[in-house]
Amino acid sequence: MLTNSLALALLPLTLTLANPLPAPAPADTITIANAGISAADTVPNSYIIVYKSTANDGQIKKYHGEILAKLGKKPVAEFNINGFKAANVVTDAAGLAKVGKNDLIDYIEKDAYVSVSPTTNNTKIFSGPSAQSLVQQPSATWGLGRISHKLRGYFNYIYDTSACQNTRTYVLDTGILIGHSEFQGRAVWGANFIAGSPNTDEHGHGTHCAGTVAGANVGVCKKGTVVAVKVLSKTGSGTYAGIIAGMQWALNDAYARGMQKRSVFSMSLGGSYSSSVNAAVASVVGYGIPVVVAAGNSNLNAASFSPASAPSAITVGASDFWDYRASFSNWGPGLDVFAPGVTILSSWFTCNTCYYYLDGTSQATPHVAGLAAYLIAKEGLSTPTAIVNRIVSLSTKNQVVNALTSPNRIAYNGNGN
């Protein structure tokens, strides 16, 4: 593992010594857990310090006081998610060397960029006087048809009338155009972690994903609520620290509303492998809320990406209309299920009646997040373990072509033939 160290400059000796002096002891080194990450992927001079599970709040507060004394500034963010305790410190390598050695620290990571999973098919924008004029049930999207039938090729969506009623799906993304006609008042603004940005979607990705979760015509959940948690900018990018902050806020919000057993996190985003992001996901799941994440669009093993590699997450790959694994979809034994992710029509951010086609594991993920909320409402499932087990047991087996080492499952709600 690479390490960062401070170089010591020694003045040249002018004396000639018969026996050379021993080399000076090296300066304290700070081990960085993800030191091998590409420099292009890292947020300059930003680190996530993760504390040991034994560190208590008083000890951490004292340590943060030491950071203030040594650096002249406090951590820019502090995290406490069900035993996952961490801080985001902005400083250079010299500053990190001053504060990065403490018995409370479990590990330190470089903060890094995350982004929406890139999409490959932006074919057409639709607009009309109302959502009803665009698509009506039973004339549903092929994705809704696929997750409600054992066989491919259907365009009618079969679902229970509970339809995710009294559930909240937190969409951690670029925000949501909450006034879009698809949501019928069931989209609400939650929190914004992009400094200086407005409380709306400036990119489109979040609105598209939210529509697949809860759109009246293009969504899984006809009666469910989606909550905008803006952690990605108008360029579709964000940071590890911002993602963790968004998860912490959403968890606290769900508990404050007494909705922790009726909530789901949908995270169609990703970056390089991160122990801290995966640990934060595990903490949210440990607190009783399922976290559904995109496998990623690099046609690589999802184990190299986060949060896709988080063992406690429900990791979703993308399949197409013909049940082939999408050519871009990440794969591997860490996936839980595939879902429709090619040529997916959903709500768009440019107007309240606009729609757009996108491809990606980002589009597959909200199908499964919606399914998780659907099962909470329909079957009364109340734990992440029960939800993922039910998704796996219901799934259509051995239909994905070229699943590689992934579990061969397609998401299914248990209704149509």
PLM features: residue spans?
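Autoinhibitory propeptides
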Residues: 21-39, 53-55, 65-143
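Active-site-adjacent substrate-recognition loops and nearby beta-strands
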Residues: 134-137, 154-162, 200-202, 293-313, ...
